[in-house]
Amino acid sequence: MGLLSEFKAFAVKGNVVDMAVGIIIGAAFGKIVSSFVGDVIMPPIGLLIGGVDFSDLAITLKAAEGDVPAVVLAYGKFIQTILDFVIVAFAIFMGVKAINRLKREEAVAPSEPPVPSAEETLLTEIRDLLKAQQNKS
């Protein structure tokens, strides 16, 4: 089997395709969460603490000189990134929790006993007939 056909067999497997779809959806979800945090959550928080825009919060370590830009610690962006992470982690936690609950419900659901095969049914009837004959004698 050639390298190309091996790769094709690997790439077409369900798990690889599912993983790729998950990564793409995860990246899109990350962008949505970043927008949610930056555009919806942080402005009211900034307003509550005095009209501060968190993305602008920074400590200047060295001022700009000529063409050399300033060296800054942009801790406001870091706070937003931490909030992004917390929201994504919480969403993943809730998703995993829901999946685990569904798995537990499936495991707890009583399964019907297997229907005996025709051979087992016949053997059971023969056993019962032999016991009945033994009890008569």
UniProtKB/Swiss-Prot annotation:
The chain crosses the membrane at residues 9-29, 79-99. Keywords: Cell inner membrane, Cell membrane, Ion channel, Ion transport, Membrane, Transmembrane, Transmembrane helix, Transport. It is found in: Cell inner membrane. InterPro entries: Mechanosensitive_channel_CS, MS_channel, MSC/AndL, MscL_channel. GO terms for cellular component: plasma membrane. One of its GO terms (molecular function) is mechanosensitive monoatomic ion channel activity. Homopentamer. Belongs to the MscL family. Channel that opens in response to stretch forces in the membrane lipid bilayer. May participate in the regulation of osmotic pressure changes within the cell. This is Large-conductance mechanosensitive channel.
